[in-house]
Amino acid sequence: MISECLDRSQHFGVLRGKEQDLAEIGCTAEILTVTKKYPDGRMDIVTEGRARFEVIQLNQERSFLQAEVLYLHDQPEIASKAEIAQALKLHGEIMTLAGAEPEKSSEIDERQLSFHLAGSLPLDLDFKQTLLGMKSEAERLRAIISFFDTILPTMRRTVHVRRKAGGNGHAG
């Protein structure tokens, strides 16, 4: 399948598998680079998500799944500047607590901010799947802000405890 996509400059669809089921909402992926080719035909690839879709009907005639899909488009509701700023602030704090360098907001496309923020962190897969099905950037950003607000107190406590333990009880 990957060879076909490369030969034809096509994207492929990605669906989350859970137990014996597949999610109904997925995302197309564009192959950016092939980092390694193996003698048996397998490849290590770097991809980037492009377009969300809903599966209408699966086709199992080939060695890989194919599907008839309906592409999903966002409703025109846009996030407020305050919501964007809050999401970036919380994301930056999470990155800092995790020991990573927060990104500069000027380097992020605000039209796809929710997907960028969710994709840059190892968040709960059920939460990410829920985001994929949401109909507007504003709705996704509000969900991300709520999620970050929920996880940050635990992260702050964990980092504080680690610092205190690492300082033999003398860290402040």
Give the role of each language-model region.
Residues 1-172:
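N-terminal low-complexity, acidic/polar interaction/targeting segments
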